[in-house]
Swiss-Prot record:
One of its GO terms (cellular component) is cytoplasm. It comes from the Eukaryota. It catalyses: ATP + H2O = ADP + phosphate + H(+). Keywords: ATP-binding, Cytoplasm, Cytoskeleton, Hydrolase, Nucleotide-binding. This is Actin-6. The keyword Lipid biosynthesis does not apply. InterPro entries: Actin, Actin/actin-like_CS, Actin_CS, ATPase_NBD. Its EC number is 3.6.4.-.
Protein backbone atom coordinates (compact mmCIF):
# COMPACT_ATOMS: atom_id res chain seq x y z
CA UNK A 1 0.00 0.00 0.00
CA UNK A 2 1.43 3.35 -1.13
CA UNK A 3 2.04 5.83 1.67
CA UNK A 4 0.20 9.11 1.11
CA UNK A 5 2.54 12.09 1.12
CA UNK A 6 1.61 14.97 3.42
CA UNK A 7 1.14 18.45 1.97
CA UNK A 8 1.66 21.42 4.29
CA UNK A 9 1.17 24.98 3.05
CA UNK A 10 2.47 27.35 5.69
CA UNK A 11 0.94 30.77 5.17
CA UNK A 12 1.51 33.90 7.25
CA UNK A 13 -2.09 33.77 8.44
CA UNK A 14 -3.31 30.19 8.05
CA UNK A 15 -1.66 26.80 7.83
CA UNK A 16 -3.28 24.39 5.36
CA UNK A 17 -2.43 20.71 5.74
CA UNK A 18 -3.60 17.38 4.41
CA UNK A 19 -2.85 14.37 2.23
CA UNK A 20 -1.63 14.35 -1.37
CA UNK A 21 -4.40 13.23 -3.71
CA UNK A 22 -7.18 14.78 -1.60
CA UNK A 23 -9.11 17.62 -3.19
CA UNK A 24 -8.98 19.92 -0.18
CA UNK A 25 -6.89 20.29 3.00
CA UNK A 26 -8.03 18.30 6.08
CA UNK A 27 -6.78 20.93 8.49
CA UNK A 28 -6.86 24.70 8.18
CA UNK A 29 -5.86 26.62 11.29
CA UNK A 30 -4.28 29.98 12.19
CA UNK A 31 -0.46 30.10 12.08
CA UNK A 32 -0.34 31.33 15.66
CA UNK A 33 1.56 30.30 18.75
CA UNK A 34 0.21 31.68 22.04
CA UNK A 35 1.95 31.78 25.41
CA UNK A 36 0.32 32.65 28.75
CA UNK A 37 0.75 36.30 29.74
CA UNK A 38 0.98 35.49 33.45
CA UNK A 39 2.27 32.54 35.40
CA UNK A 40 -0.77 30.40 35.93
CA UNK A 41 -2.32 30.67 39.38
CA UNK A 42 -4.28 27.49 38.74
CA UNK A 43 -1.50 25.04 39.45
CA UNK A 44 -2.14 21.56 38.14
CA UNK A 45 -4.95 22.66 35.85
CA UNK A 46 -3.08 21.18 32.91
CA UNK A 47 -2.19 24.61 31.57
CA UNK A 48 0.40 24.25 28.83
CA UNK A 49 3.30 26.60 28.21
CA UNK A 50 2.16 27.14 24.63
CA UNK A 51 -0.91 26.77 22.45
CA UNK A 52 -1.13 26.53 18.67
CA UNK A 53 -3.77 27.44 16.12
CA UNK A 54 -7.46 27.43 17.03
CA UNK A 55 -6.76 26.64 20.67
CA UNK A 56 -4.49 29.69 20.91
CA UNK A 57 -7.20 31.68 19.16
CA UNK A 58 -9.93 30.62 21.60
CA UNK A 59 -7.74 31.34 24.65
CA UNK A 60 -6.50 34.63 23.15
CA UNK A 61 -7.83 36.56 26.16
CA UNK A 62 -5.11 35.14 28.44
CA UNK A 63 -2.32 34.63 25.90
CA UNK A 64 0.08 36.77 23.96
CA UNK A 65 -0.15 35.67 20.34
CA UNK A 66 2.77 35.47 17.92
CA UNK A 67 2.83 34.76 14.20
CA UNK A 68 6.08 32.90 13.35
CA UNK A 69 5.64 33.65 9.64
CA UNK A 70 5.92 37.28 8.64
CA UNK A 71 5.36 38.43 5.07
CA UNK A 72 5.38 34.80 3.99
CA UNK A 73 8.81 34.09 5.46
CA UNK A 74 9.53 32.12 8.64
CA UNK A 75 11.16 34.38 11.23
CA UNK A 76 10.82 32.27 14.38
CA UNK A 77 11.95 28.66 13.98
CA UNK A 78 11.10 27.47 17.51
CA UNK A 79 7.49 28.53 17.05
CA UNK A 80 7.49 27.16 13.49
CA UNK A 81 8.54 23.79 14.85
CA UNK A 82 5.60 23.94 17.28
CA UNK A 83 3.24 24.62 14.38
CA UNK A 84 4.60 21.66 12.38
CA UNK A 85 4.43 19.41 15.45
CA UNK A 86 0.82 20.45 15.98
CA UNK A 87 0.09 19.85 12.27
CA UNK A 88 1.40 16.28 12.24
CA UNK A 89 0.37 15.02 15.67
CA UNK A 90 -2.80 16.96 16.55
CA UNK A 91 -4.39 17.94 13.23
CA UNK A 92 -3.48 15.15 10.81
CA UNK A 93 -2.71 12.58 13.52
CA UNK A 94 0.11 10.99 11.58
CA UNK A 95 3.68 9.97 12.33
CA UNK A 96 5.88 12.22 10.17
CA UNK A 97 8.59 9.54 10.06
CA UNK A 98 6.21 7.43 7.95
CA UNK A 99 5.29 9.98 5.24
CA UNK A 100 7.07 12.07 2.63
CA UNK A 101 6.32 15.76 3.34
CA UNK A 102 5.76 18.43 0.69
CA UNK A 103 6.23 21.94 2.10
CA UNK A 104 5.57 25.26 0.40
CA UNK A 105 7.67 28.41 0.47
CA UNK A 106 7.29 32.04 -0.50
CA UNK A 107 8.86 33.17 -3.77
CA UNK A 108 12.40 34.52 -3.24
CA UNK A 109 12.61 32.72 0.12
CA UNK A 110 16.19 33.13 1.42
CA UNK A 111 18.44 30.11 0.79
CA UNK A 112 19.20 29.71 4.49
CA UNK A 113 15.47 29.36 5.17
CA UNK A 114 15.01 26.50 2.71
CA UNK A 115 17.96 24.73 4.32
CA UNK A 116 16.55 25.24 7.80
CA UNK A 117 13.15 23.81 6.74
CA UNK A 118 14.92 20.84 5.22
CA UNK A 119 17.02 20.08 8.28
CA UNK A 120 14.05 20.40 10.66
CA UNK A 121 12.03 17.91 8.58
CA UNK A 122 14.82 15.32 8.55
CA UNK A 123 16.35 15.89 11.97
CA UNK A 124 13.45 16.88 14.21
CA UNK A 125 10.67 14.93 12.51
CA UNK A 126 12.70 12.14 10.85
CA UNK A 127 10.76 12.35 7.59
CA UNK A 128 11.69 9.67 5.04
CA UNK A 129 11.57 12.25 2.23
CA UNK A 130 10.63 15.89 1.65
CA UNK A 131 10.31 18.56 -1.01
CA UNK A 132 9.91 22.34 -1.01
CA UNK A 133 7.79 23.97 -3.73
CA UNK A 134 7.14 27.63 -4.51
CA UNK A 135 3.59 28.59 -3.55
CA UNK A 136 2.66 30.50 -6.71
CA UNK A 137 3.86 27.66 -8.96
CA UNK A 138 1.53 25.27 -7.12
CA UNK A 139 -1.41 27.66 -7.63
CA UNK A 140 -0.70 27.69 -11.35
CA UNK A 141 -0.61 23.86 -11.45
CA UNK A 142 -3.92 23.80 -9.61
CA UNK A 143 -5.47 25.90 -12.38
CA UNK A 144 -4.30 23.32 -14.92
CA UNK A 145 -1.60 25.52 -16.44
CA UNK A 146 2.19 25.53 -16.65
CA UNK A 147 2.57 29.05 -18.08
CA UNK A 148 1.01 32.21 -16.67
CA UNK A 149 1.46 34.91 -14.06
CA UNK A 150 0.15 34.32 -10.56
CA UNK A 151 -0.97 37.12 -8.29
CA UNK A 152 -0.79 35.40 -4.92
CA UNK A 153 -2.07 37.54 -2.08
CA UNK A 154 -2.51 36.07 1.36
CA UNK A 155 -2.47 37.41 4.88
CA UNK A 156 1.14 38.54 5.11
CA UNK A 157 2.45 39.30 1.64
CA UNK A 158 1.50 39.56 -2.04
CA UNK A 159 3.64 38.43 -4.96
CA UNK A 160 3.36 38.52 -8.72
CA UNK A 161 5.14 35.50 -10.12
CA UNK A 162 5.56 34.91 -13.86
CA UNK A 163 5.95 31.21 -14.65
CA UNK A 164 7.00 29.73 -17.98
CA UNK A 165 6.57 26.02 -18.65
CA UNK A 166 6.56 25.22 -14.95
CA UNK A 167 9.49 27.36 -13.87
CA UNK A 168 9.17 30.64 -11.97
CA UNK A 169 11.21 33.48 -13.50
CA UNK A 170 13.00 34.90 -10.43
CA UNK A 171 14.20 38.12 -12.08
CA UNK A 172 10.59 39.12 -12.76
CA UNK A 173 9.02 38.20 -9.41
CA UNK A 174 7.80 41.23 -7.49
CA UNK A 175 6.84 41.35 -3.83
CA UNK A 176 4.35 43.74 -2.30
CA UNK A 177 4.27 43.93 1.50
CA UNK A 178 0.56 44.57 1.51
CA UNK A 179 -1.89 41.81 2.20
CA UNK A 180 -4.79 40.65 4.35
CA UNK A 181 -3.32 41.64 7.69
CA UNK A 182 -2.76 45.21 6.49
CA UNK A 183 -6.29 45.37 5.12
CA UNK A 184 -7.68 44.18 8.46
CA UNK A 185 -5.65 46.89 10.24
CA UNK A 186 -6.88 49.48 7.78
CA UNK A 187 -10.49 48.42 8.30
CA UNK A 188 -9.97 48.73 12.08
CA UNK A 189 -8.73 52.26 11.50
CA UNK A 190 -11.57 53.42 9.25
CA UNK A 191 -14.22 51.80 11.46
CA UNK A 192 -12.71 53.70 14.39
CA UNK A 193 -13.20 56.91 12.39
CA UNK A 194 -16.88 55.95 12.18
CA UNK A 195 -16.97 55.81 15.97
CA UNK A 196 -16.58 52.09 16.58
CA UNK A 197 -13.56 51.18 18.66
CA UNK A 198 -11.55 48.07 17.79
CA UNK A 199 -8.11 47.91 19.39
CA UNK A 200 -7.21 44.58 21.00
CA UNK A 201 -5.94 41.48 19.20
CA UNK A 202 -9.26 39.82 20.01
CA UNK A 203 -11.20 42.65 18.40
CA UNK A 204 -8.93 42.47 15.37
CA UNK A 205 -10.30 38.98 14.71
CA UNK A 206 -13.84 40.41 14.71
CA UNK A 207 -12.78 43.02 12.15
CA UNK A 208 -11.19 40.30 10.03
CA UNK A 209 -14.55 38.55 9.99
CA UNK A 210 -16.32 41.78 8.98
CA UNK A 211 -13.77 42.15 6.18
CA UNK A 212 -14.28 38.61 4.92
CA UNK A 213 -18.07 38.81 5.03
CA UNK A 214 -18.80 42.34 3.83
CA UNK A 215 -15.94 43.81 1.79
CA UNK A 216 -15.81 43.96 -2.00
CA UNK A 217 -13.78 45.67 -4.71
CA UNK A 218 -15.45 48.55 -6.58
CA UNK A 219 -15.13 48.59 -10.37
CA UNK A 220 -14.97 52.38 -10.27
CA UNK A 221 -13.92 53.72 -6.87
CA UNK A 222 -15.03 57.36 -7.38
CA UNK A 223 -18.47 56.30 -8.63
CA UNK A 224 -18.90 53.92 -5.72
CA UNK A 225 -17.95 56.66 -3.22
CA UNK A 226 -20.57 58.95 -4.78
CA UNK A 227 -23.22 56.23 -4.55
CA UNK A 228 -22.35 55.56 -0.92
CA UNK A 229 -22.57 59.27 -0.10
CA UNK A 230 -25.95 59.80 -1.73
CA UNK A 231 -27.83 56.70 -0.61
CA UNK A 232 -27.79 53.95 1.97
CA UNK A 233 -28.03 51.19 -0.67
CA UNK A 234 -24.48 50.00 0.04
CA UNK A 235 -24.87 49.86 3.83
CA UNK A 236 -24.84 46.52 5.60
CA UNK A 237 -25.25 45.71 9.26
CA UNK A 238 -23.08 43.34 11.26
CA UNK A 239 -23.77 41.88 14.68
CA UNK A 240 -20.85 41.89 17.12
CA UNK A 241 -20.38 38.98 19.57
CA UNK A 242 -21.92 41.08 22.38
CA UNK A 243 -25.10 41.64 20.38
CA UNK A 244 -24.37 45.23 19.39
CA UNK A 245 -25.18 45.86 15.72
CA UNK A 246 -22.91 48.13 13.69
CA UNK A 247 -23.46 49.61 10.24
CA UNK A 248 -20.77 49.43 7.58
CA UNK A 249 -20.99 51.64 4.48
CA UNK A 250 -18.23 52.84 2.17
CA UNK A 251 -15.71 51.01 4.38
CA UNK A 252 -16.85 47.86 2.57
CA UNK A 253 -14.99 48.85 -0.60
CA UNK A 254 -12.57 51.46 0.82
CA UNK A 255 -10.76 48.68 2.67
CA UNK A 256 -9.77 46.44 -0.29
CA UNK A 257 -9.27 49.53 -2.51
CA UNK A 258 -5.91 49.77 -0.73
CA UNK A 259 -4.78 46.79 -2.85
CA UNK A 260 -5.08 49.08 -5.88
CA UNK A 261 -4.11 52.29 -4.07
CA UNK A 262 -1.52 51.48 -1.37
CA UNK A 263 -1.26 55.22 -0.63
CA UNK A 264 -4.42 54.66 1.46
CA UNK A 265 -2.15 52.83 3.91
CA UNK A 266 0.59 55.43 3.64
CA UNK A 267 2.66 53.13 1.43
CA UNK A 268 4.58 54.45 -1.55
CA UNK A 269 4.31 51.28 -3.61
CA UNK A 270 2.14 50.79 -6.69
CA UNK A 271 -1.06 48.71 -6.55
CA UNK A 272 -1.47 45.01 -7.38
CA UNK A 273 -2.54 45.78 -10.96
CA UNK A 274 0.59 47.81 -11.66
CA UNK A 275 2.81 45.31 -9.85
CA UNK A 276 1.38 42.62 -12.10
CA UNK A 277 2.04 44.75 -15.19
CA UNK A 278 5.60 45.53 -14.05
CA UNK A 279 6.26 41.81 -13.53
CA UNK A 280 5.10 41.05 -17.06
CA UNK A 281 7.26 43.87 -18.45
CA UNK A 282 10.33 42.30 -16.81
CA UNK A 283 9.76 39.17 -18.91
CA UNK A 284 10.91 38.42 -22.42
CA UNK A 285 8.85 40.09 -25.13
CA UNK A 286 7.93 36.72 -26.64
CA UNK A 287 6.17 35.36 -23.57
CA UNK A 288 4.21 38.44 -22.50
CA UNK A 289 1.19 37.51 -24.60
CA UNK A 290 0.98 34.14 -22.82
CA UNK A 291 1.21 35.87 -19.44
CA UNK A 292 -1.46 38.49 -20.19
CA UNK A 293 -3.89 35.77 -21.20
CA UNK A 294 -3.18 33.62 -18.12
CA UNK A 295 -3.34 35.88 -15.07
CA UNK A 296 -4.23 33.58 -12.18
CA UNK A 297 -5.48 34.92 -8.84
CA UNK A 298 -4.56 32.96 -5.74
CA UNK A 299 -4.77 33.34 -1.95
CA UNK A 300 -7.34 34.62 0.52
CA UNK A 301 -6.87 38.32 -0.25
CA UNK A 302 -8.03 37.73 -3.84
CA UNK A 303 -11.41 36.45 -2.59
CA UNK A 304 -13.15 39.86 -2.67
CA UNK A 305 -16.14 39.99 -5.01
CA UNK A 306 -15.36 42.28 -7.95
CA UNK A 307 -11.58 41.86 -7.84
CA UNK A 308 -11.27 39.99 -11.16
CA UNK A 309 -13.32 42.56 -13.10
CA UNK A 310 -11.33 45.41 -11.59
CA UNK A 311 -7.99 43.71 -12.40
CA UNK A 312 -9.20 43.22 -15.96
CA UNK A 313 -10.18 46.88 -16.27
CA UNK A 314 -6.90 48.17 -14.79
CA UNK A 315 -4.66 45.87 -16.84
CA UNK A 316 -6.56 46.62 -20.03
CA UNK A 317 -5.72 50.30 -19.55
CA UNK A 318 -2.01 49.52 -18.89
CA UNK A 319 -1.41 46.91 -21.60
CA UNK A 320 -1.08 47.45 -25.37
CA UNK A 321 -4.56 47.96 -26.82
CA UNK A 322 -4.61 44.81 -28.97
CA UNK A 323 -3.59 42.56 -26.08
CA UNK A 324 -5.97 39.80 -25.00
CA UNK A 325 -6.23 39.87 -21.22
CA UNK A 326 -7.71 37.07 -19.21
CA UNK A 327 -8.01 36.97 -15.43
CA UNK A 328 -8.58 33.50 -13.99
CA UNK A 329 -10.17 33.50 -10.54
CA UNK A 330 -10.86 29.88 -9.55
CA UNK A 331 -13.55 29.56 -6.84
CA UNK A 332 -11.20 27.45 -4.68
CA UNK A 333 -8.34 29.98 -4.93
CA UNK A 334 -8.18 30.39 -1.17
CA UNK A 335 -6.61 26.93 -1.10
CA UNK A 336 -5.12 26.67 -4.59
CA UNK A 337 -1.53 26.53 -3.30
CA UNK A 338 -2.44 23.51 -1.18
CA UNK A 339 -4.44 21.93 -4.02
CA UNK A 340 -1.48 22.35 -6.38
CA UNK A 341 0.72 20.64 -3.78
CA UNK A 342 -1.78 17.81 -3.51
CA UNK A 343 -1.73 17.35 -7.30
CA UNK A 344 2.08 17.50 -7.50
CA UNK A 345 2.60 15.14 -4.57
CA UNK A 346 0.36 12.50 -6.10
CA UNK A 347 1.88 12.51 -9.62
CA UNK A 348 3.77 9.31 -10.42
CA UNK A 349 6.38 11.36 -12.31
CA UNK A 350 7.05 13.41 -9.17
CA UNK A 351 8.06 10.45 -7.06
CA UNK A 352 11.73 10.60 -8.14
CA UNK A 353 11.87 14.31 -7.25
CA UNK A 354 11.67 13.84 -3.47
CA UNK A 355 14.78 14.54 -1.40
CA UNK A 356 15.30 11.32 0.55
CA UNK A 357 16.70 11.01 4.07
CA UNK A 358 19.66 9.16 2.54
CA UNK A 359 20.44 12.02 0.15
CA UNK A 360 20.15 14.47 3.02
CA UNK A 361 22.54 12.42 5.16
CA UNK A 362 25.05 12.33 2.30
CA UNK A 363 24.86 15.98 1.19
CA UNK A 364 23.40 17.99 4.07
CA UNK A 365 20.76 20.73 3.88
CA UNK A 366 22.17 22.32 0.71
CA UNK A 367 20.70 19.38 -1.26
CA UNK A 368 17.46 21.41 -1.30
CA UNK A 369 18.90 23.90 -3.81
CA UNK A 370 19.84 21.12 -6.22
CA UNK A 371 16.57 19.22 -6.07
CA UNK A 372 13.92 21.89 -5.53
CA UNK A 373 13.82 24.74 -8.00
Amino acid sequence: EEVQPLVVDNGSGMCKAGFAGDDSPRAVFPSIVGRPRQQSIMVGMGNKDSYVGDEAQSKRGILSLKYPIEHGIVTNWDDMEKIWHHTFYNELRVAPEEHPVLLTEAPLNPKANREKMTSIMFETFNCPAMYVAIQAVLSLYASGRTTGIVLDSGDGVSHTVPIYEGYALPHAILRLDLAGRDLTDYLMKILTERGYSFTTTAEREIVRDIKEKLCYVALDFENEMATAASSSSLEKSYELPDGQVITVGNERFRCPEALFQPSFLGLESVGIHETCYNSIMKCDLDIRKDLYSNIVLSGGSTMYPGIADRMNKELTSLAPSSMKIKIIAPPERKYSVWIGGSILGSLSTFQQMWITKQEYDESGPSIVHRKCF
